[in-house]
Amino acid sequence: ISKYQLWEWTQGVGLYGLYNYYKLTGDRGTFDFLCGWYDARMAEGLPERNVNTTCPMLTLLCVYEDTQDERYGALCRDWAEWVMHGLIRTGDGAFQHMITGDANDSQMLIDTLFMTVLFLAKAGVVFGRKDYVEEAKRQCLVHIKYLYDTSCGLYFHGYDFKGRHNYGRVHWARGNSWYTCGIMELIGLIPIEPGLRQYFLDTFRAQVDALCACQAGDGMWHTILDDPASYKESSATAAFAYGMLKGVR
């Protein structure tokens, strides 16, 4: 149980799922749990700020919208300013994928889109900061530029600006899933001009076509998408299903 009391990306993803469950069902117990979780973590003291510890901020911002509790609002404003002006940048101004205990010098990872960019985008809408919204869109474009594999429609996990390479050029399932569900979330969070919206949708559809081509017979996806000898991975499969369903809707 103790690991669920940590402030990290894994908890952040789960919290966002719980918040969306609350919005769907109106279950007040779920919302009260979320408020209690944030109150307890804030009382304990928050961890260092990085890409992954930004993930829980997305749901906190949602909770702030519903409660207008300025304890939450003040933290969200301050953290969003840190993302915009304090988070380390690497090549082309991309957010460096700095995480707890590792700065990941000069490295870009696709995970950042879900972990950090979604929060910045929503903060731009909630706080009326157009610069946040524009930066969120730009970060998506830069990540697509370096991580999208035009030969097949899938994504590489990362890019090293020092070595100028995509590591082993591996199409990792969970990494790809951050784009599948993340880009659908982004489109729902912020206003996007028609041309850019179409571009995001086109890259999404190209990825989905590629994913369908490498889906296993039982509906799962392998952890290396185009390597059927690699094990099947449930978290990526769930994220792909989520993103695809949201795309259809």
Mark where each language-model region is.
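Glycan-recognition and catalytic cores of secretory/periplasmic carbohydrate-active enzymes
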Residues: 1-249
